[in-house]
């Protein structure tokens, strides 16, 4: 039975590989080809949806109703990526057995993670070299367009002026001739420390976390700052600037295609390869090249729409014209005079054709590159970026287990396990970006700090119901650590005065930190063994009137009415209006006088007489009991 299942799985895997190979060769797949290659029992609706999604989104292979003409994909931006196709093949080989088995995201993540083999030291070096090679290809290709480096040099000018941090620009420099150092003994020490940490108790882990939190704000910057000598950076940037200026001058004088210009561009590329840019700066450079080519492709698609889709020009002819002429518009007149049937239909769109070609010419003028040169540079940048991205992905996927092992130590700290894994993976990706294999350490040794830093920072930033700034979290952790030390020394809880003296901080700030450190408690917290009562039931609602106050006010109202009944109707009404009894508001003497059609003085006299009557002991005794003693 097991052999049959294994044989079926192998057959299914082979069919998936055949399907992917066909899609990679053709650049597309049709629904008929998918149905023919896959066995009928494999086309489960849920799996079929996953198959189409993986083909189009992950592998970049479009799925069509019918086969297109041979040149349909000529100007398409979506080109199947060989590594993406291989990855999609692996996903599809696993997904059939996964569907219906479990929906737990953690188990699914663990299972997929387990399909990736661990790396040896040699594998790590090989992948790191591929990453470096891909980045070198990108930077060398960008050097062929020296104008792209203007922004980088301008940012360094801001660094010199103090308006920009050097660590926000570069992570360091690479010496291509440097040999790989050996630190095997130190790696073993690190491994021993990791084993000890895994077996340590929760208290030690808490202290570790607090120390990590305490230093995390400065560790990141210090780690980067110590690796970059400002004097070395100044020397390197000066060298880059001089070669950049020299290259532009030669291009301006002799043209970009000449041997002198190519030699200077090669020298510029060798210098620029030594720079390791931060990912944000690297992405900005790559994006600038992509945006440049995006404008060209847009105009070419406009021309294709007119010439091929509307006029009916054969695609072979269109591709030949665009490749040969670029922005040159001399071919338009010849095309309009052509005897071919599509030529007459072009006359109506002559202005739009010239407009698109003019836009291409403007792009060439702005960039000082021909369309062919732009395409060559951008293709080289894309190949290098793809190579580096694939290698980084391999390194990340092979070390996901390391993130899991570290994240397990930080459970029950306020974040869910999947959130801890996600934050740890972000730290892992940063470690891949900054890893320097020439220093001789294993990648796991280097990545552990970055993963812990990402996890502890996320706990400090997100775990609390009420967010507290990270610097305040550091102060709280330091205060807690010193409180435990004083408790061990004195055998009792330390007072705010003692904490302030030990920490060298004002006492009022210590009290403030102690107040902030308190965790909020839910009002739904159950009280007692049963769940009938909650904490909120025992908290006084200051917005409501107390029953005693309500009863007192009601009794006072009744007593006041009884006392007023002992006065004449006129006196009682005057007092009611003057003091707002049973009314929305009180009234002035003048307002009451108008009501009775008498003067203000007369109302004052009536009021005084009524109050004298109420002060008589026979009447005042009833109201005196309501006065607060």
Curated annotation (Swiss-Prot):
Signal peptide (from-to): none
A UniProt-annotated Pfam family: Sigma70_r2
GO term, biological process aspect, one: DNA-templated transcription initiation
Motif (Interaction with polymerase core subunit RpoC): 419-422
Bias type Acidic residues, positions: 187-228
DNA-binding region(s) in UniProt: 589-608
Region of interest called Sigma-70 factor domain-2, as start-end residue ranges on this chain: 395-465
Chief localisation class: cytoplasm
Keyword Amino-acid biosynthesis annotated: no
Subcellular location as annotated: Cytoplasm
Similarity comment text for this entry: Belongs to the sigma-70 factor family. RpoD/SigA subfamily.
Protein name: RNA polymerase sigma factor RpoD
Native source organism of the sequence: Haemophilus influenzae (strain ATCC 51907 / DSM 11121 / KW20 / Rd)
Gene giving rise to this polypeptide: rpoD
